[in-house]
Amino acid sequence: MASGVTVNDEVIKVFNDMKVRKSSTQEEIKKRKKAVLFCLSDDKRQIIVEEAKQILVGDIGDTVEDPYTSFVKLLPLNDCRYALYDATYETKESKKEDLVFIFWAPESAPLKSKMIYASSKDAIKKKFTGIKHEWQVNGLDDIKDRSTLGEKLGGSVVVSLEGKPL
């Protein structure tokens, strides 16, 4: 069921910037987004980038010790969100980086919010071409342990996420 919600151009720009890893200067790399949240506009007609709800690559090791834990803390406890998380992980064979699309729909969110976010999910997913991993999360217990994301990324072959062993 489509909700008629549209995706703001800035959301698509953020996605494309996160997806394309062109060779960049050190300054450009620091400005790359590691994680970003998207929400519905106040009038519930557009999916927009949520202001100040992001982690930049340059923040890691500076103001952000562990990007995964910091990302989980950005999620609102009582409302839904969409998120992109640029996961850096290691398998038994190699290091990898993949974008993960996350639909955050906690049990404590209002029913109306869960319904409009669920019915608008396809609109944003269609704009995020090439995403390999999608994850619907219904509460902190599902997301606070990084090993759950490790399983989504590659099951038992994933040995670490963001430099931390699983």
Curated annotation (Swiss-Prot):
Keywords: Acetylation, Actin-binding, Cytoplasm, Cytoskeleton, Nucleus, Phosphoprotein
InterPro entries: ADF-H, ADF-H/Gelsolin-like_dom_sf, ADF/Cofilin
Cysteine-cysteine disulfides: none
Keyword Disulfide bond among UniProt keywords: no
Modified residues (N-acetylalanine): A2
GO BP, sorted A to Z: actin filament depolymerization; actin filament fragmentation; actin filament organization; muscle cell cellular homeostasis; positive regulation of actin filament depolymerization; sarcomere organization; skeletal muscle tissue development
Reported function: Controls reversibly actin polymerization and depolymerization in a pH-sensitive manner. It has the ability to bind G- and F-actin in a 1:1 ratio of cofilin to actin. It is the major component of intranuclear and cytoplasmic actin rods. Required for muscle maintenance. May play a role during the exchange of alpha-actin forms during the early postnatal remodeling of the sarcomere.
Subunit relationships: Interacts with CSRP3; possibly two molecules of CFL2 can interact with one molecule if CSRP3.
Entry's family note: Belongs to the actin-binding proteins ADF family.
Protein name: Cofilin-2
Organism in which the protein naturally occurs: Mus musculus (Mouse)
